[in-house]
């Protein structure tokens, strides 16, 4: 579909759990929900592009994710991770969303192939970037952003993500302060 583009078709499905394949075959939250007010993008492009974008409609008063959607490019694992994390996000407060872990996503998919484990980190970093994007759209400063969505640029998840909208937003905010 236009929302999911698999670039690694030669990989087949070896190593993918039946649960993950079922999620990919039956995802319901592809695309950007109408009226989205937050979005994020994470991914890599070295040795093949794998990326995901998350979109959310968030309620300002309750700081809750009402609806979530995604677009992916790459492999089945990134599509499964994006779909599952969108399902987890719906109805969550921002604090609950930020508490979603790689283990939660891995468990929900009954695992991902060992060589695709980075896609779980992409999903979690995309959630963090989604919350960060919403806060910045609401006028949060860099200091306020760091208080809610701290970033360690030397952490493994951050280094895995060659492209990260949250990192780009931070750079823009730092440049504006300079």
Question: Can you say where each PLM-predicted feature lies in the sequence?
Answer:
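C-terminal binding/interaction regions
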Residues: 1-34, 39-41, 59, 92-96, ...
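Short beta-strand elements
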Residues: 50-60
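Short small-residue beta-strand/loop micro-motif enriched in glycine and branched aliphatics
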Residues: 63-68, 79
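A short interface-forming secondary-structure element
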Residues: 57, 68-75
């Amino acid at each position: 579909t236009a929302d999911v583009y698999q670039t690694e078709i030669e990989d087949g499905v070896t190593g993918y759990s039946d649960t993950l394949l079922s999620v990919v075959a039956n995802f319901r939250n592809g695309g950007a929900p109408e009226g989205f007010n937050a979005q994020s993008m994470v991914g890599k492009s070295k040795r093949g592009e794998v990326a995901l974008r998350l979109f959310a409609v968030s309620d300002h008063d309750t700081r809750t994710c009402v609806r979530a959607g995604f677009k992916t490019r790459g492999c089945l694992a990134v599509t499964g991770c994006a779909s599952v994390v969108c399902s987890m996000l719906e109805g969550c407060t921002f604090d609950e969303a930020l508490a979603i872990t790689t283990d939660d996503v891995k468990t929900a998919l009954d695992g991902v192939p060992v060589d695709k484990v980075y896609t779980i980190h992409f999903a979690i970093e995309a959630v963090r970037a989604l919350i960060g994007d919403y806060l910045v759209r609401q006028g949060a400063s860099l200091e306020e952003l760091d208080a809610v969505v701290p970033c360690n640029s030397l952490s493994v998840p951050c280094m895995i993500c060659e492209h990260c909208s949250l990192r780009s937003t931070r750079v823009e905010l730092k440049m504006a302060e300079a």
